[in-house]
């Protein structure tokens, strides 16, 4: 199951849309920055998701933007689409770390720079997003230690 959402980001005074897909565990599947928020933009985002994963999800959860329905019917007709109120909170909340990073960087300077940063940030976020509420303290500490070990190996390489 994927939770999909889009949010606007201003880059040099122009409005761009950051499309984000989050899985049922809260891990970021993909982020994609586009200038538009129409059906064609949604189809591009869906094609990108399908290319990276190879299969379509059983269900997608979105807000009530009509572009999602058009893209789903065209590219993933067998996938169930839910756009119930509050069902998309997982994707809505996944924008918060991005907004914090955006403020820290004093906004993005170009769409290309924003896409590079957001793609890398999603990978790092998934690595350190350990779902603490699902584990005991001892297991959480073990997973965190393993995560930092992998991070140190990746950074040292």
Put a short name on every predicted segment:
Residues 1-157:
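Residue-level recognition of single "structural anchor" positions
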């Amino acid at each position: 199951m994927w939770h999909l959402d889009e949010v606007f980001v201003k880059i040099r005074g122009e409005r761009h849309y950051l499309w984000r897909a989050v899985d049922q565990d809260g891990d970021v599947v993909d982020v994609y920055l586009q200038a538009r928020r129409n059906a064609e933009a949604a189809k591009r985002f869906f094609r990108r998701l399908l290319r990276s994963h190879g299969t379509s999800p059983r269900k997608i959860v979105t807000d009530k933007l009509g572009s999602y329905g058009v893209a789903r019917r065209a590219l993933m007709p067998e996938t169930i689409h839910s756009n119930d109120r509050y069902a998309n909170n997982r994707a809505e909340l996944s924008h918060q770390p991005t907004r914090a990073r955006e403020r820290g960087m004093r906004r993005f300077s170009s769409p290309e720079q924003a896409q590079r940063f957001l793609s890398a940030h999603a990978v790092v976020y998934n690595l350190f997003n350990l779902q603490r509420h699902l584990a005991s303290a001892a297991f959480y500490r073990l997973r965190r230690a393993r995560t930092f070990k992998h991070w140190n190996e990746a950074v040292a390489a």
